[in-house]
Amino acid sequence: MAKPSYVKFDVPPELAEKALEALKKAKETGKIRKGTNEATKAIERGQAKLVLIAEDVQPEEIVAHLPPLCEEKKIPYIYVPTKKGIGEACGLQVGAAAAAILDPGQGKDVLDEVIKRVSELTGKS
């Protein structure tokens, strides 16, 4: 299946897993925002440290505004394969199209590694 139009770079599966791990640790010991609307607000306010966007969102327009907004605000973002993965990492029973990490808590090391690898993938630091 072709990648949706809003997916601007490929993320290796192990890096997507690390991003979800950072989200889970941030949920337990730090601060996160769940869902597209909350993630959008966190980006606009400059609070987000990393934004996770699911690749299986339909319709695409729900999250299509996130990558350009993150780039404008210079906030790193990463794609993960499924909404279900983001939802589970957030402690939800349902999927979430996007989530933002505001405070990584004990997941700071994992978050820093993910951000470093994302900047290598995108060529931005």
UniProtKB/Swiss-Prot annotation:
It comes from the Archaea. Its main location: cytoplasm. One of its GO terms (molecular function) is rRNA binding. Keywords: Cytoplasm, Ribonucleoprotein, Ribosomal protein, RNA-binding, rRNA-binding, tRNA processing. Pfam families: Ribosomal_L7Ae. It is found in: Cytoplasm. One of its GO terms (biological process) is translation. GO terms for cellular component: cytoplasm; ribonucleoprotein complex; ribosome. InterPro entries: eL8/uL1-like (IPR050257), Ribosomal_eL30-like_sf (IPR029064), Ribosomal_eL8/eL30/eS12/Gad45 (IPR004038), Ribosomal_eL8/Nhp2 (IPR018492), Ribosomal_eL8_arc (IPR022481). The keyword Plastid does not apply. Multifunctional RNA-binding protein that recognizes the K-turn motif in ribosomal RNA, the RNA component of RNase P, box H/ACA, box C/D and box C'/D' sRNAs. NCBIfam families: eL8_ribo (TIGR03677). HAMAP family: Ribosomal_eL8. Part of the 50S ribosomal subunit. Probably part of the RNase P complex. Belongs to the eukaryotic ribosomal protein eL8 family. This is Large ribosomal subunit protein eL8. It comes from Metallosphaera sedula (strain ATCC 51363 / DSM 5348 / JCM 9185 / NBRC 15509 / TH2). The gene is rpl7ae.
